[in-house]
Amino acid sequence: MLIILTGLPSVGKSTFSKAFSKKMAEKNIDNIILGTDLIRESFPVWKESYEEFIRDSNNYLIKEALENKFSVIVDDTNYYNSKRRDLMNIAKECDTNYVTIYLKAPLNLLLKRNIERGQKIPNEVIKNMYEKFDTPGTKYAWDLPDITVDTTEKIDYNEILNEILEINENKNLKIEEDKIPKSEPVESDLVKIDSLTRNIVGNLIKTGKIDKKDIKLLSEIRKSFLKDCKKIESEKLDFEKIEKDFLDYLNKNLK
């Protein structure tokens, strides 16, 4: 079974996944927590050039775990419905069920929690992600979450596990082809560019190369760059050039 978590930074995904994993183990359900951040944090330094390897490695580990009959908890933001769709398709490829869990909390609480844990991610980035977040089920019926968890309230892990086991028993595994769409190349490329530029910005802030007072401006510059990228034809996209162009664009507009 593939358990897909989705939710913004500081909503409590890691806390939830660890507690839920332990609860599954108590019921003798072999499981593992996987996610891109777990791989990303294994590097001594971050480089944008690592991102494709990180994504591919995470997908490979998920597939291997599912094929070896482990239940997998995916601890990632999965803030775009396309990311959730790709995970659903992995479950389908591995002939296993998936369950989506949407963890939510108000923006003001997310920002407060982020400050309390040392602002690993700048609050301005979380605000930007909050604005762009594809709330599960608001666009497509296939994206409706199986379970929604309000992390401002006490979480009953036993109840959630029982609900998941029931869903797993009753859910039709052989989903028809048209229920979960395949990735559209243009959309997929734009998601990659969004992720690429977001990681570059996050790294610049984390390493202190950008002054905190410029974070809001940096976010606006990134948005402007992404708008320009939408005009590029998919077959003409060169991600190495886009990375260089984005850094040049930042240098030019931050002066």
Swiss-Prot record:
Pfam families named in the record: KTI12
Swiss-Prot/TrEMBL keywords: ATP-binding, Kinase, Nucleotide-binding, Transferase
Binding site for ATP: G7, L8, P9, S10, V11, G12, K13, S14
Gene3D superfamilies from the UniProt entry: 1.10.12.40, P-loop containing nucleotide triphosphate hydrolases
GO molecular function, one term: L-seryl-tRNA(Sec) kinase activity
Parts forming coiled coils: none
Name by which UniProt lists this protein: L-seryl-tRNA(Sec) kinase
Organism the protein comes from: Methanococcus maripaludis (strain DSM 14266 / JCM 13030 / NBRC 101832 / S2 / LL)
Record gene name: pstK
